[in-house]
Amino acid sequence: MKGKFSIVLHTHLPFCLGKGRWPFGEEWLFETVFDTYLPLLKVLNELVEEGKRFKIVVGLTPVLLEQLKSYYFKEKFLEYLDQKEELGKKDLVHFKGNPTYTKLTEYYLREIEDIRNLFVSLNEDIVSGFISLERKGFVELITSAATHAYLPLLKNDLSREVEVKSGVIIHKNWTGTSPSGFWLPECGYKPGVEEILKENGIKYFILDAHSLVEGREVIMEYGRRLPKLKIPDESKTFLPYEIKDDLYVFLRNPSTSEQVWSRDFGYPGDGVYREFHKKFEVSGFQYWKITDKNVPLGEKEIYNVDEAREKAKVHAHHFVSLLKEKLSSFYRESGVEGIILSAYDTELFGHWWYEGPLWLKEVLSLISEDKDIDSVSPSDFIKTGVRRKGLFRESSWGLGGFHYTWYNSETSWMWDMIHEDEDEFKSLFHELSGKEGSLLLKEFLLELSSDWPFLVTTSQAKDYGKERFLEHRRKFLNIVEFLKGIKRETVDLDKIETEDFIFKDLMIEDLRR
């Protein structure tokens, strides 16, 4: 054995059920479940059935867990599948007489049926599918901040503590286990966060490689685009760092992450893979391949499933050989077995990169048969006792490695409001109780979601991001007024609770224990 490999999949979507349908809203979740979560469960279960030995880490954010477990999601997702199937049947009529397109439509219709059957076989409970794999030893589930708040920019430690502790509580409520690992939203780190993680029983978290402090530290300016932080010598990512007693930092390996993440330089940009951006006007089905990244959408060639599958296997072999080469080199130089940790947004696999789940299955299968490398979780590697010491800078995995993606000229007004509301929440925290206090907590957490400034900055759904932020802030302030005896007759707590139906079992009293 020359080393270990750990793949970490960060799985998150903001609270979107009942908050619009298309193009912005709950269809985000339905699409990602169809494209990614269920295909991922499918390939992992296939590996188990084939007798492969493997381990991966799946992070499920608490806000996503709550949505996947809701009756609303289960009902609406089945409706989504029915609608998708009906649109596919219309494609069959449209493409009648064109066997190339008809064959692909039939393939997609079978895929819909397979996904429906898998969902039903899980009793419409995707979370239980991951829990089952964890209990069998193939998956390690980790948690995150309750609503994926961007922790470094929060004003008060109490806000960070509430996000972290709520996340751990919700994870325990749904999985029955205490999480060992914690995904800092956007890998956003600020010195001192580790104290909060340790207080909540966390054993490890993950940062981008450039977070490691080397030499003189540079003071960053908030709100400006800055040159990308320098990535250290890659060998410094091959062992974890003990940041506090029994709390470890694992660094994302830069080159293996880029090899998979990048559409321009990585595997997903290969011309034979399915083109994400071109969709048929009737169904939204994707019938074309990338062909070449410089080819206009109107000139894309027809997608070939078999060709793409073969290329995914080729890329899996290349990736495993890359892992072995890097781990062997580190072993020769250091005399110890290292670990390569590669972390990605889960939706890359299937949603953005259609062939991603197949590639992942092939990678884990190849590693299972290889004597020089083993797939493990960070928890497994910690038990080896091999570690380093290190310091880490305020950072993220966002643009430039700092905070610009969430804090800039377009979003600074959001943070002014957030900081005001943090102070309000802090002033009330020790007096809050019962339904009203727990409802205030919920709206506070939803206001803190990092997704709202992200959507504004990236222009993916700028107006939607602003509206959602202001919606939850308005509800937070209304509940504050209710608690203070102001306008009590105009604040409908039941309506707020119905509209924002997650976190029903999260009690404000639990956070003070």
Predicted feature residues:
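Hydrophobic, small-residue-rich alpha-helical packing segments that form membrane-like cores
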Residues: 188, 193-202
